[in-house]
């Protein structure tokens, strides 16, 4: 079962060059979430 999931988790050969970018993509929404707090701190949590 784990090998089946691992097979689906691997990028196709044509996209192997983008693997580092794909690893970072899930973190982008977290940066926006943190940006909200920084922005609100800058304007005083109004």
UniProtKB/Swiss-Prot annotation:
Topology relative to the membrane: Single-pass membrane protein
NCBIfam families from the UniProt entry: PRK02553.1 (NF002715)
Protein name: Photosystem II reaction center protein K
Subunit-structure text: PSII is composed of 1 copy each of membrane proteins PsbA, PsbB, PsbC, PsbD, PsbE, PsbF, PsbH, PsbI, PsbJ, PsbK, PsbL, PsbM, PsbT, PsbX, PsbY, Psb30/Ycf12, peripheral proteins PsbO, CyanoQ (PsbQ), PsbU, PsbV and a large number of cofactors. It forms dimeric complexes.
TM spans (from-to): 25-45
Keywords linked to the UniProt accession: Membrane, Photosynthesis, Photosystem II, Reaction center, Thylakoid, Transmembrane, Transmembrane helix
Organism listed in the record: Prochlorococcus marinus (strain MIT 9515)
Propeptide: 1-9
Gene Ontology process terms (BP): photosynthesis
Pfam family, one: PsbK
Localization (cell): Cellular thylakoid membrane
């Amino acid at each position: 079962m784990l090998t089946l999931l691992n097979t689906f988790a691997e990028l196709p050969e044509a996209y192997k060059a983008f693997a580092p970018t794909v690893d970072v993509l899930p973190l982008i929404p977290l940066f926006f979430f943190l940006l909200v707090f920084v922005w609100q701190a800058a304007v005083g949590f109004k």
